[in-house]
Amino acid sequence: MPDEAQHLTAAKPDSAAGAAAEPAAHAQDGGGPVEHDRSAPADKPAERTRPKPAPPERPRPPPPRARAAGQPAARSGGSSNRVRARLARLGVQRANLTHPVLEPLLRIVRANDPKIETSTLRQIEKAYQVAERWHRGQKRKSGDPYITHPLAVTTILAELGMDPATLMAGLLHDSREDTEYGLDDLRRDFGDVVGLLVDGVTKLDKVKFGEAAQAETVRKMVVAMAKDPRVLVIKLADRLHNMRTMRYLKREKQEKKARETLEIYAPLAHRLGMNTIKWELEDLAFAILYPKMYDEIVRLVAERAPKRDEYLAIVTDEVQSDLRARRIKATVTGRPKHYYSVYQKIIVRGRDFAEIYDLVGIRVLVDTVRDCYAALGTVHARWNPVPGRFKDYIAMPKFNMYQSLHTTVIGPNGKPVELQIRTFDMHRRAEYGIAAHWKYKQEAVARASKVRTDVPKPAKGKDDHLNDMAWLRQLLDWQKETEDPGEFLESLRFDLSRNEVFVFTPKSDVIALPAGATPVDFAYAVHTEVGHRTIGARVNGRLVPLESTLDNGDLVEVFTSKAAGAGPSRDWLGFVKSPRARNKIRAWFSKERRDEAIEQGKDAIARAMRKQNLPIQRILTGDSLVTLAHEMRYPDISSSDAAIGEGHVGAQNVVQKLVQALGGEEAASEEIDEAVPSRSRSRKRRSNQDPGVVVKGVDDVWVKLARCCTPVPGEPIIGFVTRGSAVSVHRSDCVNVESLAREPERILEVEWAPTQSSVFLVAIQVEALDRSRLLSDVTRVLSDQHVNILSAAVQTSRDRVATSRFTFEMGDPKHLGHVLKAVRGVEGVYDVYRVTPGPQP
């Protein structure tokens, strides 16, 4: 297996099924993270019609099994049992001929439990028949029959090793909501357990996840889970298949569902210990929300995989050799790397991709807990452990009952190696989580079936069964006993960028706040006026300072002032955590300190103009400011100045709009040369560098390339006569063309006529995963392409994405394509494109 993530394979029926009379399933293949589809669907991506179907037909019994000619009568004992078993399997195969599309699913079911009863398989087939009949005529967004979706979901459940009741519920999970097949009918046909599961999934589908999830929403999920955790397993399989087949939805809906998957379903799979599902959900959602970063990480992984695999093979061989010498039976494999986890480490830990991906991880699986610690000692005897990196999750399991030994050692060539050591049973739980309970039972039967029947088998002790259920019971008890859903909500992480705390009002209402919130945040969450007038607080009956940090379960009461002039303090902005409180405080000062903001706005405009050497008195006229204020949808000049002073509008943006209203910088200041800057920064009216443009019908005219759109040869252009009697050349699609067209008499026809001395301005934007020496590498590549960099601006966002903008001179615009290609080859760069320095939105 390659060292990359290997996802569950989706239900992909045999090709023969597509030609069968019954509708064939066309579920997408999950594959590895490179292969799976990046597009993605809603939870119910179907255009459903609701015809009234006939009642479902009962499956026909298998034909009687006739004894072949010459066949001796069955003898009693083991021989007769084997004959009956063969005939039973033959009957199942014959029965399956009615629905060949079911064969891939039933093949997995029989592999999980070779001794499964024929009647149980018939019940699964019956569930398919009922679902197919009630969904007949309904279509998914892809145009496929809707039955392909529940069939694919059920195949995922079968791969998880779920029991027959869960498989039947998977086939029927949409029947109650989308058809007239009622709960009473379902219970009559398939029993109370299947009815309970389908009803639970239907109720869970109605839970709406808002931006700030309420405690009641979380309680609904816990209640649904407490009744039977298989409800959530079905829901996760449902979401996984929808994520695999989301490309048929509109982009906006894809992103909405992908974000919901990252914030709700992937953390939920993590809470249930179902890491196999969690990893694939994260990678699929990551590919939809951040496609460029996803593609770049995929490319970087593919680039480094050969060397990493070579080093991994060396480490694996040495570990296996040492364990073999100690007579410890073990399986040693490379640990998968998942694209979203790589991305998260880049963001959260601020580490370079090379540092993350080159850290090799291996997994050691053994038979017993004693062997786990023996293997740990063996590894530490060969390589020195890194202090502080050992974790014993066997003695102290995680919240989802994850158990393993974690250690990091200094491996060959001085490189760190991460190891996870656990038993096979622990690994099963780590991969499948809550689903491992059912998978464990199925695999135990499968192993038993391979033992010779004439050899006595040890009886499974009563305590073994109780211990097997203890993990499931402990997880459910933990959920039931958590009256305050804060801890559960923290695990779901409705906002991945922060944790939350839950506090109570004096009336016992629950208020959700960011971690580290204060009584001031609480006050603004209750009401804006309560926040503005807050003067003190009491937490759990004790007076506390307003900057005190609140914890889960705190009972908070605030005191307010009735004075007419009561208001917030600017100091509060230094410790409040919630966006609501911060925005409300700023809004108050925006209203109450209007004069101060207006003065700050005026000063900001003046500073921006002085920085560009622009004539302030000429530009800042009353008419121009009033016109601009109205264009920006402010009632007057004071309002626009206040907006600038408060930081709502950039001063540079306002100055640029004022200059453009006067016809550009060349019109605003005739003394400032607006031609493309030469290396000597000449201020002469005629630069030595020819702009390479001629005006039709006019000779000896001063021609300049407009900086607002920086046209280059080959692009459609127009000329505009400025107030300085020069001709400013713009691209035909320039953002300023609309305003220029208001004076058609000043527009001239121009055309390109570049000469050897022509030089053009080009601005490009580079987007990359942030790392050390990134700027150095990009500028080196630009220098190698023989372009003259005039300016560079770099900023890094909180998600560790570096955005760089470079402005440079070049003589041949055809060379731009080579420049962009060279920059795109820099490690970590996932997008580079030309930009125009037009007005900022």
Curated annotation (Swiss-Prot):
InterPro entries xref list: ACT-like_dom_sf, ACT_dom, Beta-grasp_dom_sf, HD/PDEase_dom, HD_domain, NT_sf, RelA/Spo_fam, RelA/SpoT_AH_RIS
Q: Which reaction does it catalyse?
A: GTP + ATP = guanosine 3'-diphosphate 5'-triphosphate + AMP
Record GO biological process:
antibiotic biosynthetic process; guanosine tetraphosphate biosynthetic process
Lineage top rank: taxon: Bacteria
Task: Describe the location of the HD domain by residue ranges.
Answer: 146-243
Q: Where is the TGS domain?
A: 499-560
In the Enzyme Commission scheme, what number(s) does this protein have? 2.7.6.5
Keyword set for this entry?
Answer: Antibiotic biosynthesis, ATP-binding, GTP-binding, Kinase, Nucleotide-binding, Transferase
Which enzyme class?
transferase
Disulphide-bridged cysteine pairs: none
Q: Name one GO molecular function term.
A: kinase activity
Entry keyword annotation includes Magnesium: no
For this record, the Gene Ontology CC terms, alphabetical, are: plasma membrane
- Name of one Pfam family that matches: RelA_SpoT
Q: Where is the ACT domain?
A: 763-837
**Low complexity bias locations:** 10-27, 66-75
For region Disordered, the annotated ranges are 1-82, 669-691
Indicate the family of this protein: Belongs to the RelA/SpoT family.
Name of the molecule in the record:
GTP pyrophosphokinase
State the taxonomy lineage: Bacteria, Bacillati, Actinomycetota, Actinomycetes, Kitasatosporales
Gene of this entry:
relA
